[in-house]
Amino acid sequence: MSSKQTQLKKGKQPSWIEIYLPKEVRPYAHLARLDKPIGSWLLAWPAFWSVALIADLGSLPKMLAIFGWWAVWIRGAGCTINDYFDRDFDKKVERTKSRPLASGAVSPAKGLWWLAFQLFIGLGVLYQFNILTLALAIVHVPFVFAYPLMKRITYWPQAFLGVMISWGALLGSSALKGSVVPSIAYPLYISSFFWTLVYDTIYAHQDKVDDAKAGIKSTALRFGDATKIWITWFGIGCIGALLLGGFIVNIGLPYYVFLAIATGQLIWQIFTVDLSSPMDCGKKFVSNQWFGAIIFTGILVGRLFP
């Protein structure tokens, strides 16, 4: 039975991958999660925030395109290495057992070749920048590789993910300024770190039952019934860092209006999410693309109307 037929049998609509891509490349597109762009958005937003705060309007579209390209391919590489390390675990989890490496649609060796290709394409686009930016991008890769292993050794893999996924805030600064400017990059990095702890803890609640059986650790299992208390504090850290960052660079008042809207979105997530419902956890997780977009818009408008 084809993947498209399987999805229809389960009542799911086939993604654009099944509709438009040749059969031979579909497993690789699924391995990179190309039909689920939320991960690319979450990796891209810290870079977009940094670029929006620094770039002149004329170069902004080009810079966003470059870092958007980087985010898609590096996120894809992250998904590939995650699935490579987790292929035996994924077979035991209902939500992940059909992934290409777990199901056997892609062999481990071919998965590693696909990983190398994605890294080459993702890092190659940054070659046009200064040596510091390229070096930071290369240093980032071991963090991408190590993240899947953190789930085996600590209940805080989400914190490690925060370190890794916030990297774009540093890259945006180094690409445009030639250095990591603390007043610009650090508040954005810290806010993204705490934001990651919020949304990925919510995400981890989708699989907490299967994860506990498989021996996979997460903040969802660590916090348990106290999850909302923990992620409320993380949310305060996120908004606090964004507030401080705005003050440091003396951004315009409209930024704070958008920050208030983003705060409302984050409060809505935290206080309405049903942590016992994998479906609701998934929806709240995906809604974070809008949190990132609101902050990005606020930075732009705050710069235009100081």
Swiss-Prot record:
Membrane topology category: Multi-pass membrane protein
UniProt key word Glycoprotein: no
Taxonomic superkingdom: Eukaryota
Induction context: Up-regulated in the dark and by methyl jasmonate or oligogalacturonide. Down-regulated in the light and by ammonium or 2,4-dichlorophenoxyacetic acid (2,4-D).
Keyword Magnesium: yes
Gene Ontology CC annotation, any one: endoplasmic reticulum membrane
Predominant localisation class: endoplasmic reticulum
Cofactor annotation: Mg(2+)
Protein's cellular compartments: Endoplasmic reticulum membrane
Gene3D superfamilies noted in UniProt: UbiA prenyltransferase (1.20.120.1780)
One GO MF term: prenyltransferase activity
Tissue distribution: Expressed only in roots.
Transmembrane intervals: 38-58, 61-81, 119-139, 153-173, 178-198, 229-249, 251-271, 285-305
HAMAP family attached to this UniProt entry: UbiA
Family according to the record: Belongs to the UbiA prenyltransferase family.
Record function comment: Prenyltransferase involved in the biosynthesis of shikonin, a naphthoquinone secondary metabolite. Could accept only geranyl diphosphate and not dimethylallyl diphosphate, farnesyl diphosphate, or geranylgeranyl diphosphate as substrate.
Protein name: 4-hydroxybenzoate geranyltransferase 2
Organism listed in the record: Lithospermum erythrorhizon (Purple gromwell)
